[in-house]
Amino acid sequence: SDPVNTTKPNILLIIADDMGLDATPGFSIDTSKPNMPQLEALMNSGVRFENVWSNPVCTPTRATILTGRYGLRTNVINVGDVLSTNETSIFDLMNTNAPEYSHAVIGKWHLSTDPNHPTSMGVDYFAGLLAGGVQSYSNWNLTENGDTNNTTEYATTKFTDLAIDWVDSQTQPWFLWLAYNAPHTPFHLPPGAASSLPTDSASIEANPLPYYQAMIEAMDFEIGRLLESMTDAERDNTVIIFVG
């Protein structure tokens, strides 16, 4: 018989913000879809879960993923509720039961505005956005392990750059929670987008759908850039989970 593979897999959890089945390839809901070759490739080579439900808003969903508990038990039921540091997180459990894993959260947190909250929840490395949104994807506050500074780097690209750098520095099995802010408002045309869409706010407000889709396409491109930065062996040994 073939030898058993004892190599522990890496785990990559990718979270899109405000993206439903209407914008997801492979589902019949809605006929206008963004172009997402990276996600389509993952779906075609993986498993598609068709009976999965989430909270309709950010904070309770993220708290449930982090703790495995319903909002009625964590008291996180509304946008902006703070998750108590007394809760046991998946990172706490990994620290206890799988200490060989390194782990990070990169991107949107939205469980507290305390810059030390992610590390208090057991996260080895946090770099991202504490709040629920930004006024501009190109002018926002980046918090990295407790230190907050303004950045003008495009958020979707910056999160990917941080993810690439972190993954590249790992020497042991890893778990990366990569939470994009896209395609959450404000709707806009991403930099470098191959489109002739006008960029004034009146045009966006009049017909936001193509801008929403362009933001998703930019995120899909960045997912591809992250995957392409890995070696074939590392990518083959990585469990990739995409949720919206």
Which positions does each model-derived feature cover?
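Formylglycine-dependent sulfatase
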Residues: 2-244
